[in-house]
């Protein structure tokens, strides 16, 4: 089946990738409901909502600092790099991700749409200030503060991620949907397909006549519409697919 998938991609002009937590789990990024005891006693709804932040911003920031420190130790894995290779070959138009861990960017993905934000970006709760902490060199400073403040207006900063009950960023979602409408193939990697509206993406590709290729360790909500289901870890499966694509294009 790897050969058949490679054939689809090799002849594709407008493929996209749609990625979820599974691709990052292989890099050691803890999933939200991971087994780390420290935050297990809290439900995600108690930490990742606007209400939780209004009630106890210090606790929410402690949780996000813990996550940031965990993610800083993670490195992109072969699956991230395989997607970069497909982009370099001119096959992949964009990577649309539900992940906030910045690993696609670190791997070298150029056209990246982050539907759920980025944990290394902060935004002000009052004014329109935003900052990508890896670029501004202020990451260490922010991690040391109990309650990071906006350098422009002094109000509280918050992580620039989408919390439960918040809408997805309109611009990113529109871009993602437009790409999906034009896509002739979508690589669905490591997502449960349960979080909407992001999970509409494979369905849009399917309805527009494109091929749905799923790479996952287990079947998901997307599997019933997948034309190809490659069972396995993305870090093992995707490099094999890319190798085959290269062979076909030689």
Swiss-Prot record:
NCBIfam families per UniProt: PRK00481.1-3, prot_deacyl_CobB
Source taxon at top rank: Archaea
InterPro entries registered for this protein in UniProt: DHS-like_NAD/FAD-binding_dom (IPR029035), NAD-dep_sirtuin_deacylases (IPR050134), Sirtuin (IPR003000), Sirtuin_cat_small_dom_sf (IPR026591), Sirtuin_class_III (IPR027546), Ssirtuin_cat_dom (IPR026590)
Lineage start: Archaea, Methanobacteriati, Methanobacteriota, Thermococci, Thermococcales
Major location category of this protein: cytoplasm
Cofactor(s) of this protein: Zn(2+)
Transmembrane segments: none
Alphabetized SUPFAM superfamilies for the sequence: DHS-like NAD/FAD-binding domain
Domain Deacetylase sirtuin-type: 1-250
Binding-site residues for NAD(+), renumbered to this chain: 20-39, 98-101, 190-192, 216-218, 234
EC class (word): transferase
Cofactor binding: number and manner: Binds 1 zinc ion per subunit.
PROSITE patterns referenced in this protein's UniProt entry, alphabetically: SIRTUIN
Family: Belongs to the sirtuin family. Class III subfamily.
One of the Pfam families matching this protein, by short name: SIR2
Molecular function as annotated in GO: histone deacetylase activity, NAD-dependent; NAD+ binding; protein-malonyllysine demalonylase activity; protein-succinyllysine desuccinylase activity; zinc ion binding
Catalysed reactions, as listed in the record: N(6)-acetyl-L-lysyl-[protein] + NAD(+) + H2O = 2''-O-acetyl-ADP-D-ribose + nicotinamide + L-lysyl-[protein]; N(6)-succinyl-L-lysyl-[protein] + NAD(+) + H2O = 2''-O-succinyl-ADP-D-ribose + nicotinamide + L-lysyl-[protein]
Binding residues annotated for Zn(2+), in chain numbering: 124, 127, 150, 153
Subcellular location: Cytoplasm
Signal peptide limits: none
Organism this protein belongs to: Pyrococcus abyssi (strain GE5 / Orsay)
Active site: 116 (proton acceptor)
EC number from the UniProt entry: 2.3.1.286
Protein's recorded name: NAD-dependent protein deacylase
Function, in words: NAD-dependent lysine deacetylase and desuccinylase that specifically removes acetyl and succinyl groups on target proteins. Modulates the activities of several proteins which are inactive in their acylated form. Deacetylates the N-terminal lysine residue of Alba, the major archaeal chromatin protein and that, in turn, increases Alba's DNA binding affinity, thereby repressing transcription.
One cellular-component annotation, GO: cytoplasm
């Amino acid at each position: 089946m790897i050969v058949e998938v490679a054939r689809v991609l090799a002849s594709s002009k407008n493929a996209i990738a749609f990625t979820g937590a599974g691709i990052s789990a292989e890099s050691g990024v803890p999933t939200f409901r991971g087994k780390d005891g420290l935050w297990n006693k809290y439900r995600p709804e108690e930490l990742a909502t606007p209400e939780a932040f209004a009630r106890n911003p210090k606790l929410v920031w402690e949780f996000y600092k813990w996550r940031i420190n965990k993610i800083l130790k993670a490195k992109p894995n072969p699956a991230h790099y395989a997607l970069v290779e497909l982009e370099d070959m001119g096959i992949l138009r964009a990577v649309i991700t539900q992940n906030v861990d910045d690993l696609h960017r670190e791997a070298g993905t150029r056209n990246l749409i982050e539907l759920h934000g980025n944990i290394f970006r902060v935004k002000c709760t009052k004014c329109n200030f935003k900052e990508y902490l890896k670029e501004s060199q202020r990451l260490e400073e922010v991690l040391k503060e109990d309650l990071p403040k906006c350098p422009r207006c002094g109000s509280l900063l918050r992580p620039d991620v989408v919390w439960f009950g918040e809408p997805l960023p309109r611009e990113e979602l529109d871009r993602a949907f437009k790409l999906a409408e034009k896509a002739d193939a979508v690589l669905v990697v490591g997502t449960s397909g349960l979080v909407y509206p992001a999970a509409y993406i494979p369905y849009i590709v399917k309805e527009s006549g494109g091929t749905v290729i799923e790479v996952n360790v287990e079947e998901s909500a997307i599997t019933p519409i997948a034309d190809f289901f490659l069972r396995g870890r993305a870090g093992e499966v995707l490099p094999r697919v890319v190798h085959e694509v290269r062979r076909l294009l030689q």
